[in-house]
A protein has these predicted regions:
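Contiguous segments within soluble domain cores/interaction surfaces
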Residues: 1-25, 111-202
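Small/polar beta-strand repeat architecture
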Residues: 26-117, 123
Length: 202
């Protein structure tokens, strides 16, 4: 996929990249609450914290149902918070004014990709595809981190990490390394926008 990220000069940043497979998984819903945020019960959902999920075919509370259960749009996926093994909250979604849930429905989400076999990662930032590397991030110096437990690659920047990088748009790619191969997790045309530093008086 082609990613779009933004960071600001002079500011630290911790950016999570959730790495998913192309497999769409479904878990049966047994309850949805008229609350803010919306809380959904789906026994044994296995959805990591901060993942994105959609709702399909729920009865009663139909407001968040995907228009087509077999062609779910990107905008129909919402970030969820892991509450426990059977429950998630839909971040920023108030269901207080929704119709009451009656039955049925599924949580739909792309299954997390296993990162257990990967030993390192690197990210090269360039002015153009095939150009010189302006900024190199990697797991060796701690600017990248592989969190296999949550299928997440973290970008970790200190407030001085971008001192030598002018504010503008760049392209980047990220590669994961294991014993026998190197796998790209995003398009080489992914965009990193470096924003100018905002200074304040002390």
């Amino acid at each position: 996929p082609k990613l779009k990220l933004s960071v600001r000069k002079g500011a630290s940043a911790d950016i999570p990249l959730r790495i998913e497979t192309g497999t769409l998984s479904f878990v049966a819903i047994s309850a949805m609450t008229n609350s803010a945020p919306l809380r959904v019960t789906a026994t044994g959902h296995n959805i990591p914290d901060g993942w994105y999920a959609a709702i399909v075919d729920a009865q009663g509370m139909t407001e968040l149902n995907a228009a087509d259960s077999n062609e779910i749009l990107d905008i129909e996926f919402h970030r969820v918070t892991w509450i426990d093994a059977n429950t998630v909250d839909f971040d920023g979604i108030s269901a207080a004014g929704f119709q009451s849930y009656t039955s049925g429905g599924y949580l739909a989400f792309y299954a997390p990709m296993s990162l257990a076999s990967y030993t390192s990662a690197s990210m090269d930032v360039k002015t153009r595809v095939g150009g010189d590397v302006i900024l190199a991030l990697n797991t060796t110096d701690g600017t990248l981190e592989i969190d296999a437990a949550t299928s997440t690659v973290w970008i970790r920047l200190e407030d001085d990490s971008l001192d030598a990088v002018p504010a503008r748009d760049y392209v980047f790619d990220i590669e994961l390394v294991h014993a026998t191969a190197v796998d790209a997790i995003c398009s080489a045309e992914s965009v990193l926008t470096v924003l100018p530093e905002v200074t304040t008086s002390v």
